[in-house]
Amino acid sequence: APDWSKIPAREITVFHAGATSFEWIGSEHPGASIVKAGQPCIICHETKKGLDYTAKKLAPREPDAQAMPKTVSFPVSVQAAVEKGTLNVRLSFKPPADSKTGSDADNELKAAIMLLDIKVPQAKLAGCWTSCHKDMRGMPGGDAKKGKYVSAGSFELLQWKSGKTSAALPAGVKVESGKDGDRTTVTFSRKLGGAVVEGRSVPFGIAIHANRAAGRMHYVSLGYRLGIGGAPGEVQAAKQ
């Protein structure tokens, strides 16, 4: 395993997006021209104090007013390293305790990273929440039978579940977890290959379901890049 004490951590804030989708990057949004110019959302919205946006603006898009948690965002510490041909990504976070209790009876907590490719529109700019959730179950006007988009091959979902039944993982992927007080650490390990190789910037996102949340009732990140082998990226996968 990598020596995490020698690897710098990048803090990424995850937020409860409510029922918002790609309308945040439409022409009515003041930052639309910046997105069209190829700049990511974090250029404007990420600050040293976390995400800079008004959480109350999410409320009108939330059909269930009681679903909005008191804690609308929280930080996740992200580290990455390449060791012996394997990419390791480590998430460390303190899940909020005031989220509305969800419907997942089997898992109190879930954490996931999504590794995206160019098939997902706006992946490297805004993050997967702008592209994947507009017509899914739980969204206003969404299809109750439509779940994840994994089968389309547009992104790779690496998920950890706190319950007794482990999440299904792609071949060559392992996950480990630990807990220190109220802080949870999850480490994903994936063999290099396919779209995830040295020299490539891999767009990725984070999703965390807290307090037995299910479906879209999760906290998500904006779009970031994982720089492997010195490639450009907000999170660098250092070689050990």
UniProtKB/Swiss-Prot annotation:
It comes from the Bacteria. Binds 2 heme c groups per subunit. Pfam families: EB_dh (PF09459). This is Cytochrome c-551. The second heme binding site has an unusual CXXXCH motif. GO terms for molecular function: heme binding; metal ion binding. The keyword Zinc does not apply. Keywords: Electron transport, Heme, Iron, Metal-binding, Repeat, Transport. Heme c 2 binds at residues 128, 132-133. InterPro entries: Cyt-c552/DMSO_Rdtase_haem-bd. Heme c 1 binds at residues 41, 44-45. SMART domains: EB_dh (SM00887).
